[in-house]
Amino acid sequence: MLIPSKLVNEQFDDRYFDVVDALNEARQIYFRNNNLIERITTGIESKTPFIIGETGFGAGRVVVALMEFVKKSGLRNISIEYNSVELYPLSPERMLDILSGFKDRVGEEIDALVETYRSIDITVAGWHSAKIQKSFGTIDLNLWIGEALEMVESLEKSCDVWFLDGHSPKKNPSIWRPELLMAIGEKTKQGGTCSTFTVASDVKSALIEAGFILNKYPGCGGKKHVLQGVKY
């Protein structure tokens, strides 16, 4: 399949997301496989934020998909802390161009993300925080500009779930290296989860070492299987 050049990250010669149905891929791999709605509902009832960690912010596709997903759930008073990392941040204009293929489906969510992203000085390394306020509640976006291991080690709170969404292990092995996945395990709550599109044996071994019990789920977007893990 021909991949549009605008979807390719030149740093890794790899696409930012699946070109078949990237929004559905995010919903299935990261949201449904992690029982997000049920777990976010528990957070609403206990008045505690649901904490997400992500490796590989890219064009913000997963954030856009998340906004659509929770909006359709009908939940209100949602509080999400979304912690992500990007070593090579895009300009807001490039982000908008990459996401433009979804404009007819999630235009409102794309506009909300890009407007929020414009408030971040992507030329400065370290943490940047901004708030996305929607009818369903609030997403506190915390974006680390820099290296993923530094981001994970600097987190003050452990996460309820991790979306492992970096470029493929063959294209960007550093974001799948054992010491990073071990640190992610250490910054995951007991009973917390992670999920990813890759079933590479090295990644599976590192996640098991990091304390996750792995489950294999049916894939989507051309992937036969995907992984989900539970921290014990």
Residue spans of the language-model regions?
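Rossmann-like AdoMet
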Residues: 1-50, 65-104, 110-112
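Conserved beta-strand/loop positions that form the S-adenosyl-L-methionine
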Residues: 53-55
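Glycine-rich SAM-binding Motif I of class I
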Residues: 59-64
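S-adenosyl-L-methionine
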Residues: 96-155
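Short SAM/SAH-binding signature in class I
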Residues: 141-143, 157-166
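Conserved beta-strand signature within the Rossmann-like core of class I S-adenosyl-L-methionine
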Residues: 161-164, 190-198
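A short glycine-rich, Lys/Arg-flanked "PGG" loop and its adjoining helix->strand segment in the class I
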Residues: 174-190
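Class I S-adenosyl-L-methionine
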Residues: 200-232
